[in-house]
From Swiss-Prot:
One GO CC term, this protein: plasma membrane-derived thylakoid membrane
Species lineage: Bacteria, Bacillati, Cyanobacteriota, Cyanophyceae, Nostocales
Subunit structure, as described in the record: The 4 large subunits of the cytochrome b6-f complex are cytochrome b6, subunit IV (17 kDa polypeptide, PetD), cytochrome f and the Rieske protein, while the 4 small subunits are PetG, PetL, PetM and PetN. The complex functions as a dimer.
Name listed for the protein in its UniProt record: Cytochrome b6-f complex subunit 7
Family to which the UniProt record says this protein belongs: Belongs to the PetM family.
Source species of the chain: Nostoc punctiforme (strain ATCC 29133 / PCC 73102)
Subcellular location: Cellular thylakoid membrane
Membrane topology according to the record: Single-pass membrane protein
Any Pfam family: PetM
Transmembrane segments: 9-27
InterPro entries found in the cross-reference section: PetM_cyt_b6/f_cplx_su7
Amino acid sequence: MGGEILNAAILSFGLIFVGWGLGALLLKIQGGEE
């Protein structure tokens, strides 16, 4: 049970981190073009 909760927490954190990284990268690309 504990392992499942930990796995879900890591997955959620990973998705948030990836989404934040992609957003920051897109802002950098748009800022560089303009």
